[in-house]
Amino acid sequence: FCAALCHTPMDAYYDSYATGETDKYGMEVQEADRASMTAYQHQVQAGTTCMGCHVPTLSEQIGEGLAWVAGDYEVAGDNLKGQAILSTRSLSQLTEARGAEGNDFCMNGDCHDLTQEELEAATADLGPRNPHSFAHGEIACGDCHKAHSRSVNKCGECHGDAALPDGWLAPQAANAMAAGAMAAANSAEA
């Protein structure tokens, strides 16, 4: 609905949410790896809708509507399917209009209702590489948990022995795949 009427740049994101067959870059995602895309996983496991995660304020919707009419929004390029994709936004940017902190996008009373300390305790069995312990400072949920592309274990940037959950990517692989997909899509246009 949203993509059909107004948000043409949402096609790539909707496809990753609805079927999980491709990520926002238009790259095929094997069935066994689809659960690593949190939008798809939440839709399949909990029936979460787009608006279940993206909770816009009225002022945000008006601003987006005006930007859409004026064509004043930033497109990063086209994906491999020729669909426009937007510049990546952080969780802090996605929650700014609500006056919420970035991790509140995920950790709130409607979704993952727990504190940072409770999350760290729940994953304590991961040992010294517990990604929720923030041994190196605070890391936003979205730095690892990706909604419309395969999730990435950020710890792997420095720790080569960091465990990769099923379907997840090491940071280097994720960066290379995204860059390769964008380059291929944009060279196809030329």
Q: Where are these predicted regions, by residue range?
A:
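Short sequence/structural segments immediately N-terminal
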Residues: 1-190
